[in-house]
Curated annotation (Swiss-Prot):
A GO CC term attached to the entry: mitochondrial inner membrane
Its biological purpose: Component of the mitochondrial ribosome (mitoribosome), a dedicated translation machinery responsible for the synthesis of mitochondrial genome-encoded proteins, including at least some of the essential transmembrane subunits of the mitochondrial respiratory chain. The mitoribosomes are attached to the mitochondrial inner membrane and translation products are cotranslationally integrated into the membrane.
Pfam families reported in the protein's UniProt record: Bot1p (PF12298)
Protein name from the UniProt record: Small ribosomal subunit protein mS45
Gene that encodes the chain: MRPS35
More info: Present with 3460 molecules/cell in log phase SD medium.
Keyword annotations of the record: Mitochondrion, Ribonucleoprotein, Ribosomal protein, Transit peptide
PANTHER family reported for this sequence: 37S RIBOSOMAL PROTEIN S35, MITOCHONDRIAL (PTHR28158), SMALL RIBOSOMAL SUBUNIT PROTEIN MS45 (PTHR28158:SF1)
Transit peptide segment: 1-27
Source organism (scientific name): Saccharomyces cerevisiae (strain ATCC 204508 / S288c)
Lineage: Eukaryota, Fungi, Dikarya, Ascomycota, Saccharomycotina
Membrane-traversing stretches: none
InterPro entries to which the protein is assigned, alphabetical: Ribosomal_mS45
């Protein structure tokens, strides 16, 4: 609510001007975003007790505290351990976020301040679709949680590529995983094995790994609905802007012509390039058949890093003296490569 002044003036014959001012109140169009479900609102209270209905609704949602200051009766307090994410679902629970910490039965805060079972059983929380459980944002049904891989599956992928000599394309088609993800699994498993040999995996890392693994759903290659779309092409950055082109009515215009207008390669070439990504792909040896000279420095005892020197062409590396370098700037330009990954330009 704001205040303003409005004035009028009048002038009588033979007299000076007369001004009249009136104070007017202007109401703001903004409305407080109260919860859409019913909750206990504040009544008459002491003027010095500065409390709001939003704070009251928040306390009703969180529930009572224990002696440690933790909201143990809130269903979102504990970390899930059954590979089912526990995302907030306000459109289904409608304020019923409390449950017994032992029996897991729903509770509701009554108007007299006591806790008890809800008078009406919420049937929305009984028959929930599986896709709804994987939705982290209630208002965005298109965003779904990805599936994590079990340690046994990651070890199998690592052995099939490094020991049996299979290519990344063969493993990708077998398990229904994208080639960049298969390459990342091989790299991460090799790093994890090297850390285990050196005893560099602490107990905190193991605890965090087990906790995150139990929080998210597990990937199953036998289930067809869990397999990834291997023919999916990342959206190029140049297609996000509109392009207008005037052509004749009888002139043919297809996807290849659209790719030329947008300065993009056809989808067939993009899929072919995506299939050769990674050092374990079938076409990697043919694409990198050039001999490169590498010189390794002497590894001093006690050090974990080793210098590596490779040949470089002048003008291809480094920055020219006097040229602008925006590596440390906040507004550095960001682009996207063929895989859809963000890269600095």
């Amino acid at each position: 609510m704001s205040y303003g002044l409005t004035g009028t003036s009048s002038k009588l014959r033979g007299t000076s001007s007369i001004f009249s001012w009136t104070q007017v109140r202007h109401f703001s169009r903004r409305r407080i975003a109260y919860p859409f479900y019913p909750f206990k609102k504040l009544g008459r209270q002491h003027p010095k007790k500065h409390d709001t209905n939003l704070k009251t609704a928040m306390r009703q949602f969180l529930g009572p505290k224990n002696y440690k200051g933790e909201y143990v009766m809130n269903k979102y307090f504990t970390v899930p351990t059954n590979h089912v994410p526990n995302y907030i679902k306000p459109d289904l629970e409608r304020g019923q976020s409390l449950e017994h910490p032992v029996t897991k039965k729903p509770l509701q805060l009554r108007y007299d301040g006591t806790l008890g079972p809800p008078p009406v059983e919420n049937k929305r929380l009984q028959n929930i679709f599986k896709d709804r459980l994987l939705q982290p944002f209630p208002s965005n049904p298109h965003c779904k949680t990805n599936y994590v891989l079990s340690p046994q599956l990651k070890q199998s992928i690592f052995e099939e590529i490094t020991v049996e000599g299979l290519s990344a394309q063969q493993v990708s088609q077998k398990y229904g995983l994208k080639i960049p993800r298969v390459e990342a699994i091989v790299k991460l498993v090799s790093v994890e094995n090297s850390w285990n040999r050196r005893n560099r995996v602490s107990s905190d890392l193991k605890t965090m790994d087990e906790t995150l693994y139990r929080m998210f759903p597990v990937f199953d290659s036998d289930a067809s609905f869990k397999r990834e779309n291997l023919s999916e092409i990342p959206v190029p950055q140049k297609t996000l802007a509109s392009r207008f082109l005037t052509i004749a009515e009888s002139e043919p215009f297809g996807p290849v012509d659209a790719a030329h207008v947008l300065e993009l390669e056809p989808a067939v070439e993009t899929l072919r390039n995506l299939s050769t990504v990674g050092e374990h792909s079938s076409g990697h040896q043919q694409s990198t058949n050039k001999n490169t000279k590498v010189i390794y420095g002497e590894l001093v005892e006690g050090e974990r890093s080793q210098y590596k020197f490779t040949n470089a062409k002048v003008g291809k590396v480094g920055y020219r003296y006097g040229s602008g370098n925006r590596d440390n700037k906040k507004d550095r330009r960001i682009g996207f490569n063929k895989l859809g990954q963000m890269v600095y330009i």
